[in-house]
Amino acid sequence: VNLWQVDIRPADGQPDSLGVQAESAARELGISNRLQIQGIHGFLVQGSLDAPSASKMAREYLADPIAQRVETALVGDPKLSAYGGDSKQLVHVLLKPGVMDPVAQSTLQMLKGLGFAADEVRTFRKYWISGHPSGESEVISRLASRVLSNDSIEQIVLGPLKMDKLSIGAPYSLTLTRVPIDQLNDKELMELSKSGQLYFSLPEMQQIQSYYRQIGRQPTDIELETIAQTWSEHCSHKTLGGRIQYQDENGTRQFSSMLKETIFAATKKIRETLGANDWCVSVFKDNAGVVTFDKEHHIVFKVETHNHPSAIEPYGGANTGLGGVIRDPLGTGLGAKPICSTDVFCFAAPNYPPDELPPGVLHPRRVISGVVSGVRDYGNRMGIPTVNGAVYFDDRYLGNPLVYCGNAGLLPVDKVEKKPHAGDWIVALGGRTGRDGIHGATFSSVELTSESESISGGAVQIGNAITEKMVLEVILQA
């Protein structure tokens, strides 16, 4: 079994988009205005491939023969470093182990279908950097962590890659783990909540402790994770659904459930007032709202936010924000056809002084670029246009941007209702569970801090538009 590295670079006369983007970001973030950066992307392919097969694979199927050139060799071969020159700092950027790599998955599927003996594939980016003073490692370190990579999901390798195989992870065997909480004091309960990324409040932890004392046993780790997910802000809207006292110039109002007593109540009253002219079909009961359109179709519409994920991994956060909201009309009734998307973004000013950024906060320019690219790319891969949007700037969004993604779909008038029955099959489709996306729901219940990127980086899921596109086609045909 060999491990081949395929470097794909621009052909002579073609623009170096990766290098240009990195140089621009380095200037904008105040890292350096003297750097010259060359960038390429590539694949690591593991399998029983000889040199002629690897060369054919790379030349004919992994690169554009007109706009790109390839260099194929076993990992560690010196010629893989020659393109940028020996005097330049070489930096590789790879996804961390366990993070889903949709491009690699699609590539592996293609190569196997073409008859190549490929077992595993990984993607990477590669940069050669010059123009910094000799020995000024701080510049390279800042550039690598703030421009070339995102530490929440990616890792940096300085110099040539040194490996002889791709790690595919360790085998997993279920071990029943019980968490002893019956004798924990309040401080220890909150330490457990934080260390486990459960993000319960103290009263919630006390309630869980009380319940398991009553039934006479300790909870399993899976039970705690399940309760944390169900009670999270993301899933239960604790803030909007909670008891709130509101005071203004007109006095004080007490809400037992703010969401039910405002938005829900107002909608119900308007529908009752309209009577026979009510154009709402399904409200607050399915994955998306449904309103009348014509004799054959209803309009399905849903908007959701993806703020916390976009704050620590802008591209992935916005990418899965749109992917998730496309899923909602698709899962409404017996399945609506998503036809267009919309968005609203709220950011801090793009010219915010880099040296005034709080610890752990990404610069607004990087957030803006990542969010816009994430929404654009996912919609393009799904074949669903983003037809309108809005942007608002205010420095109060520095630590946590607002990223609203919406989608509209068409639903046949006779496909509004669905009812599951005992014996129905439940089918899970998508990427295997990996490092990404873990604690994505509970992450919504905690405030962002300077440690969020390192502690909760894995909470941001990697989108897989290619798989969702296939799921969409299957559901609509069914």
Mark where each language-model region is.
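Core nucleic-acid recognition elements
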Residues: 1-478
